[in-house]
Swiss-Prot record:
GO biological process: glucose metabolic process; glycolytic process
PANTHER family noted in UniProt: GLYCERALDEHYDE 3-PHOSPHATE DEHYDROGENASE, GLYCERALDEHYDE-3-PHOSPHATE DEHYDROGENASE-RELATED
CDD domains associated with the record: GAPDH_I_C, GAPDH_I_N
Species: Kluyveromyces marxianus (Yeast)
GO molecular function: glyceraldehyde-3-phosphate dehydrogenase (NAD+) (phosphorylating) activity; NAD binding; NADP binding
EC number: 1.2.1.12
Full protein name: Glyceraldehyde-3-phosphate dehydrogenase 2
Phylogenetic lineage: Eukaryota, Fungi, Dikarya, Ascomycota, Saccharomycotina
Record InterPro entries: GlycerAld/Erythrose_P_DH, GlycerAld_3-P_DH_AS, GlycerAld_3-P_DH_cat, GlycerAld_3-P_DH_NAD(P)-bd, Glyceraldehyde-3-P_DH_1, NAD(P)-bd_dom_sf
Main location: cytoplasm
Gene designation per UniProt: GAP2
Length: 331
């Protein structure tokens, strides 16, 4: 049984807890969030505007959450280094704050007594692993990153296409649901002026490092992909539009067949496939990293094609976080 703690009880932290509770080999020992009291943590875990009410009993005793009779300690420390991870025998600390995402800052969990750390954000210093893409390269590193939700959607698709046909170059656009960093009304956003505009009433162009990050988990695609984002007024589920120049000619039917085969074999559970006339809400709660929309893609020529893949940027990503935790625990 691997003992885990969750630092940061936001959108990802709460969903990681939901998913981890369903895994028999994981025990969630503690959560930490300096901005959430234990009674409020119970309320936020029990009710979710996007994913619905938690299917179980949730209460608290003033110090711990009590979920279906199981106690989960709640701390309110700003500095992870002060957390009692050693005393609580924490094997893996999951950092979902979005703050402690580099090796030096995530090291605070190790200093506190945790054996390993999984970061739920892209990192420029910690090695990044995308389940289904490069998890076989994990060699026992102490601190790892699960990359971003968009990289988790894009990388499996890019791997399939590159292995089958070769990618010479490509551009990605993610049409991305609202996240917590955006504004309910126009407000200050000094680094990204557009990002400070009302989330619910605008399509907002934004930057993303998700496509470039694919080169970190698939070195053969280094320098071949870049991309951007449009933030749109939906609460969850996003979609990747990948336009690529192929090295080898292919028909769209051949591309569909290759993706479908991968989704049923080596990437089962990570890559999904659909030919239905779907829309974004059809993927709420979907646990795949990426669901290929066979009916949405288009082809201009045998070597130039646009591919479309959906992802629940909250639930699918959080599922992969827990998968990565299990992988790290085995090594």
């Amino acid at each position: 049984m691997v003992r885990i703690a969750i630092n940061g009880f936001g959108r990802i932290g709460r969903l990681v807890l939901r998913i981890a509770l369903s895994r028999k080999n994981i025990e969630v020992v503690a959560i930490n969030d300096p901005f959430i009291t234990v009674d409020y943590a119970a309320y936020m875990f029990k009710y979710d505007s996007t994913h619905g009410r938690f299917d179980g009993e949730v209460s608290h005793d003033g110090k711990s959450l009590i979920i279906d009779g199981k106690k989960v300690l709640v701390f309110q420390e700003r500095d992870p280094a002060t957390l009692p991870w050693g005393a609580e025998k924490i094997d893996i600390a999951i950092d979902s704050t979005g703050i402690f995402k580099e090796l030096d800052s995530a090291q605070k969990h190790i200093d506190a007594g945790a054996k390993k750390v999984v970061i739920t954000a892209p990192s420029s210093t910690a090695p990044m692993f995308v389940v289904g893409v490069n998890e076989d390269k994990y060699a026992g590193q102490t601190i790892v990153s699960n990359a971003s939700c968009t990289t988790n959607c894009l990388a499996p698709l890019a791997k399939i296409i590159n292995n089958a046909f070769g990618i010479e170059e490509g551009l990605m656009t993610t049409v991305h649901s609202i996240t917590a960093t955006q504004k309910t009304v126009d407000g200050p956003s000094h680094k990204d002026w557009r990002g400070g505009r009302t989330a619910s009433g605008n399509i907002i162009p934004s930057s993303t490092g998700a496509a470039k990050a694919v080169g970190k988990v698939l070195p053969e695609l280094q320098g071949k992909l870049t991309g951007m984002a449009f933030r749109v007024p939906t609460v969850d589920v996003s979609v990747v539009d990948l336009t690529v120049k192929l090295a080898k000619p292919a028909t769209y039917e051949e591309i569909k067949a290759v993706v479908k085969k991968a989704s049923e074999n080596e990437l089962k559970g990570v890559m999904g496939y659909t030919e239905d006339a779907v829309v974004s809400s059809d993927f709420l709660g979907d646990t795949h990293s990426s669901i290929f929309d066979a009916a949405a893609g288009i082809q201009l020529s045998p070597q130039f094609v646009k591919l479309v893949s959906w992802y629940d940027n909250e639930f699918g990503y959080s599922t992969r976080v827990v998968d990565l935790v299990e992988l790290v625990a085995k090594n």
